[in-house]
Amino acid sequence: GYQFRTDHSDTEVLVHGFSAWGVEKLVDRLDGMFAFAIWDVCGQRLWLARDRIGIKPIYFTRLGGAFRFASEIKAILTDPKIPRVVNTHALSHYLSFMVTPAPVTLFQGIYKLPAGHIMEITPDGNARARRFWNAIPGQSSLADVKGANQETLVNGVREHLKAAIEKRMISDVPIGVFLSGGIDSSANVALMSEVANRPVE
């Protein structure tokens, strides 16, 4: 086991997990949204990782032999040496589909790590990204639905949603929900009430 210095730090969990398993086994064990960077002192390399669905972002760029990264593009752009040139291809995607597909962003030379990927950056500047999770059927344990009837599928989705909501309700701060007026957010609130055993405010 590990002796924690804090009483509830996600960051400390990452540090101990990295120390015990390395980055690839660590991300396999994480359940939820995350984006993190870890400097491996022994291996002399930087690791970046982004959650399976890509809820938490992580952006990066290279300039003059330096590798820069941040959770927001505006943090990278605080360096006046970073070019501010619009990526017209990404802009076209954004205006057409309201999204810029990873790894591109609206700025040339600034990229986002794709969802479900880790990236290893060595001291000589070489960066290698690789996928650690895939939602494509046949490559995900959740995709095995052949031969299941409708009731089994509905119950399975309900149980997965309920378990996911229950995990996300573990918090030391108040929890809130944005209601869009659609079915999905209303269903989430109903399941939250069920899990909490009380009405959700």
Residue spans for each PLM region:
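Cysteine-centered catalytic environments shared across enzyme families
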Residues: 1-201
